[in-house]
Amino acid sequence: MDRAQKEKLVDELGQIFESSGVVVVAHYAGLTVAEMQDFRARMREAGGSVRVAKNRLAKIALQGKPNEKIGELLTGMTVLAYSEDPVAAAKVADAYAKDNSKYQILGGAMGEDYLDQAGVKAVASMPSREELIAQIASCIGAPASNIAGAIGAPASNIASILSTIEEKAEAA
């Protein structure tokens, strides 16, 4: 890799560190190619990406960035998992770490905040953006359905009273 390619890679990594909602750093030593492809596929499904880069170049890309502290995690065979959604990459990485003992989460960053292993697990346990939107929508919709039920209730009560009166009149 010549100098121009390295500079381009540093710029790309810098963009990743700046624009991602979450970045997870993990060791992947011992993973087979098939296992790594499976991890990449899972990450793509969730809207995230996976990048293996030279640690030295990643550390250069982190210089001056708010999440520069994750450079301390970049030792050995590391992989970067990232996504714009602040939860997606952490969820996939945590689930994959549970399925495969060779994949070990070291930590990461969420925006400007440094995350240790426990922090990544905590982020992974949070609901995703879509789940939060669904929860908010159901909370907003519940009062409206209650009001509609309350408005419709007197009409159904009147109808049942009228049918009862009609039945009594027919019986008499």
UniProtKB/Swiss-Prot annotation:
Keywords: Ribonucleoprotein, Ribosomal protein, RNA-binding, rRNA-binding. SUPFAM superfamilies: Ribosomal protein L10-like. GO terms for molecular function: large ribosomal subunit rRNA binding; structural constituent of ribosome. Signal peptide: none annotated. InterPro entries: Ribosomal_uL10 (IPR001790), Ribosomal_uL10-like_sf (IPR043141), Ribosomal_uL10_bac (IPR022973), Ribosomal_uL10_bac_type (IPR047865), Ribosomal_uL10_CS_bac (IPR002363). GO terms for cellular component: large ribosomal subunit. Belongs to the universal ribosomal protein uL10 family. This is Large ribosomal subunit protein uL10. It comes from Dinoroseobacter shibae (strain DSM 16493 / NCIMB 14021 / DFL 12).
